[in-house]
Amino acid sequence: MPKLYDNKVDVAKKPGWLKIRLHRTAQFAEVDRIVREHALHTICSSGMCPNKAECWSRRTATFMILGDVCTRSCRFCATRTGRPLPPDDAEPGQLARSVKLMGLRHVVVTSVTRDDLPDGGARHWAAAVEAIRRENHDATIELLIPDFDARPELLDTVAAAKPDIIGH
């Protein structure tokens, strides 16, 4: 049990093996520049991922489409909740160009949940896959999709774009 001294808790320090040094490498800076220049979002930033520096330094990122404001408020997620802006029609093309600039062979895409859209964003998902495929023929595309309110026809819309991997 921690000792209390003047209303302060005596907290043990983290063990050395649990500490990591965050280095801002040239690769990290390049990923950051590409994401910013193309007005993209990543779950790495929006979700406050503790592995962001490590991943971005290896030129990997999980792109987040359909904005950075979610219509749900899941306890496990750090993404902002509220009333999102309409989908950006330029986003699929910007995403595809970013993938090309980063030289990615495997692309991971997720999104906020968009219960405010009649199709939950399914057509936007399909457009993103198609744009990535047009500009990055050899890249594999992995999608981490929302539940689309359990509407199978919306999953069919996304699957028709032929991503390589679909997960939820």
Task: Cite the ranges covered by each PLM segment.
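Conserved Radical SAM active-site core
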Residues: 58-167
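Flexible, acidic/Gly-rich N-terminal and inter-domain linker regions that tether
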Residues: 1-72
